[in-house]
Amino acid sequence: MACSVPFNKKNLDISFFVFKPTIVIIDDLVHELKHFSLTTENLGCVQSSIFRSIHGNMIIWYGAWPRQSSKEKEELTSTLKTMLTNSISTMAVLTDYSFLEAYGGESRDGSSTAKFSTGDILSLNSAVTTTNDLNDLCYAVLAILRSRFAKIEGTISGLCFKGQSKPRMVCMHVWKSLHFCYSWILNSDQRKWMMPYLERFSIEMKYDIFRVVYVSGDNVVDFNCISTHQMIENGKENSRQGQVMQN
């Protein structure tokens, strides 16, 4: 299965929930987020995915939804945060979340969608700006993507997202392999050709590389199994109950 994101589809909302794990066994957190993905289908989520940072300590949950009003998104966000608190609050800290919309992109095969599957490599650039500068920043980043995409070896597609409730921009590249991604980072003078587009903006561009560890449609094995972290928590609870009974 693959997630397919149209370059410019006005009836689709994209959500990003960013987590910083607080446990050692990150696979347990991924396991719980897979189950969370299944439950979001009942709320209308049409596709979801999990990105795991290759070098940093970060997990991103991606969800695509039919376009909703601002009030509906606020209610949905509140519901999702409550669900996440109940399921993973002892495993990770929710550090950021936002709804975005795709507004442009490029692909090697000429299609108007970006596709990624489990195992694929993604790179994400993001920046927060002011509300007044958001449109200008977004189109500057799109201009960079369109002018450089064909020259970047190993890219499959590139996609730009614009924040809806927060003034932010996210640019995503899908790569053929981690090797191509590293080669581009190490061998290109990105600052030199990006600055003419971005020097007027007061921003801090953040960058990270992720591996896709799940997309909706993948088999989630052992749905009823208990993760290592859950067993530890259950063991603590049983111990406390035993002490109460002894007292």
Language-model-derived ranges and their functions:
Residues 1-172, 176-247:
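Short S/T/G/P-rich N-terminal loop/turn motif that feeds into the first structured element of a domain
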